[in-house]
Amino acid sequence: MSESLKIIFAGTPDFAARHLDALLSSGHQVVGVFTQPDRPAGRGNRVTASPVKQLAAQHNIPVFQPESLRSEENQQKVAALNADVMVVVAYGLILPKLVLEMPRHGCINVHGSLLPRWRGAAPIQRSLWAGDAETGVTIMQMDIGLDTGDMLHKLSCPIEAADTSATLYDKLADLGPAGLLTTLAQLADGSARPQVQDESLVSYAEKLSKEEARLDWSLSAQQLERCIRAFNPWPISYFVIDEQPVKVWKASVLPAVNGHQPGEILQANKQGIQVVTADGVLNIEELQPAGKKAMKAQDLLNSRREWFTPGNIIA
């Protein structure tokens, strides 16, 4: 392979851990790992180390967990590692300009979209909700802006009709490490050719909110079906009926019908609960009432058929 690089890795969730795992098998030297402090997680709310920390510990790599990289003390920890490059994947902390410039090759980031489309916090979900035909990963040189740095490498993949944020996350977590290793090889041998992002093509992927997850029947059935897939596995799309939230895990789109208003229940049977939208009918196939597990529409109808009487309106 080309020159072995001394790498600092900064990341936190499983998505990042998959990239660290690829680096550990690559012949490069990971000299230190930065990750978020241990935090409560899971049903028991027990304090848990991040997937990246757990993997680093298995390989006896020094781990640093600062609350911020703005202090001189923490910046000195970065400098002391004397790295050639810092690889940042879903880390969760802002890197000050001083830190960005410390390694010989600076800091590079793996971003879950085809930049400059979907800069920001939720590129996977926003690409799904928007109905994009494809997405991918971009490895970029980091600067002080929000995902504004020069692009070093891109890999794309199609967005399939059944993709959810969970399945797309897995696809990009498989795609990213290959792009990262290619980029590192190009940095090492001097063949990297950074490309400036076209500002006229920029879009922003704002962080998701639970409020956005409420189904709005004034949208089209197609938009709502994409929303359901984009918000799976979090925060899960929902509607409110009888003052109770009901999460929607799966739905399909049926042709439009005349003479009905958005939110009106058209039919409710073993095929699903059919709700009129601004354009088309949303057929809800799998849903989850409060305090229950996800279930097929027919199973909920067995206990709550009165909720879904044809002609009723879901607000």
Curated annotation (Swiss-Prot):
Enzyme class: transferase
Top-rank taxon: Bacteria
InterPro entries attached to this UniProt entry: Fmt (IPR005794), Formyl_trans_C (IPR005793), Formyl_trans_C_sf (IPR037022), Formyl_transf_N (IPR002376), Formyl_transf_N_sf (IPR036477), Formyl_transferase-like_C_sf (IPR011034), GART_AS (IPR001555), Met-tRNA-FMT_C (IPR044135)
Key words, A-Z: Protein biosynthesis, Transferase
Reaction(s) the record says it catalyses: L-methionyl-tRNA(fMet) + (6R)-10-formyltetrahydrofolate = N-formyl-L-methionyl-tRNA(fMet) + (6S)-5,6,7,8-tetrahydrofolate + H(+)
Recorded GO CC terms: cytosol
Keyword Transferase found: yes
One MF annotation (Gene Ontology) recorded for this entry: methionyl-tRNA formyltransferase activity
Binding of (6S)-5,6,7,8-tetrahydrofolate, residues: 113-116
Enzyme Commission code(s) on record: 2.1.2.9
Keyword Cytoplasm: no
HAMAP family assigned: Formyl_trans
Function: Attaches a formyl group to the free amino group of methionyl-tRNA(fMet). The formyl group appears to play a dual role in the initiator identity of N-formylmethionyl-tRNA by promoting its recognition by IF2 and preventing the misappropriation of this tRNA by the elongation apparatus.
Protein family according to the UniProt entry: Belongs to the Fmt family.
Protein's name according to its UniProt entry: Methionyl-tRNA formyltransferase
Organism: Erwinia tasmaniensis (strain DSM 17950 / CFBP 7177 / CIP 109463 / NCPPB 4357 / Et1/99)
